[in-house]
Amino acid sequence: MESVITATIIGASILLAFAALGTAIGFAILGGKFLESSARQPELASSLQTKMFIVAGLLDAIAMIAVGISLLFIFANPFIDLLK
């Protein structure tokens, strides 16, 4: 039983790490492309900024969903019932 709990904690940690890494890479690419496009066409900066914030919110949702799934696996582990 301890091995299932240990594997669950390791899996949840890996899930959170990859979600944070993906979100950070996504924000870096998004910010770089926004600055590049704003420098290329300054008259579109306001509409691009609105779209950038929408995509930034969706990128944040990835990390929040990963936290929710990790908490589900840690506190309500469905795999422990298989051992009984």
Curated annotation (Swiss-Prot):
GO molecular function (one): lipid binding
Predominant location category: membrane
The cross-references to PROSITE patterns, in alphabetical order and at most eight, read: ATPASE_C
Localization in the cell: Cell inner membrane
Q: Which GO terms describe its cellular component?
A: plasma membrane; proton-transporting ATP synthase complex; proton-transporting two-sector ATPase complex, proton-transporting domain
Membrane topology term reads:
Multi-pass membrane protein
Sequence intervals crossing the membrane: 9-29, 54-74
- Record function comment: F(1)F(0) ATP synthase produces ATP from ADP in the presence of a proton or sodium gradient. F-type ATPases consist of two structural domains, F(1) containing the extramembraneous catalytic core and F(0) containing the membrane proton channel, linked together by a central stalk and a peripheral stalk. During catalysis, ATP synthesis in the catalytic domain of F(1) is coupled via a rotary mechanism of the central stalk subunits to proton translocation. Key component of the F(0) channel; it plays a direct role in translocation across the membrane. A homomeric c-ring of between 10-14 subunits forms the central stalk rotor element with the F(1) delta and epsilon subunits.
Q: Say which family it is in.
A: Belongs to the ATPase C chain family.
User: What assembly does the database describe for this protein?
Assistant: F-type ATPases have 2 components, F(1) - the catalytic core - and F(0) - the membrane proton channel. F(1) has five subunits: alpha(3), beta(3), gamma(1), delta(1), epsilon(1). F(0) has three main subunits: a(1), b(2) and c(10-14). The alpha and beta chains form an alternating ring which encloses part of the gamma chain. F(1) is attached to F(0) by a central stalk formed by the gamma and epsilon chains, while a peripheral stalk is formed by the delta and b chains.
Stated name of the protein: ATP synthase subunit c
Native source organism of the sequence: Actinobacillus pleuropneumoniae serotype 5b (strain L20)
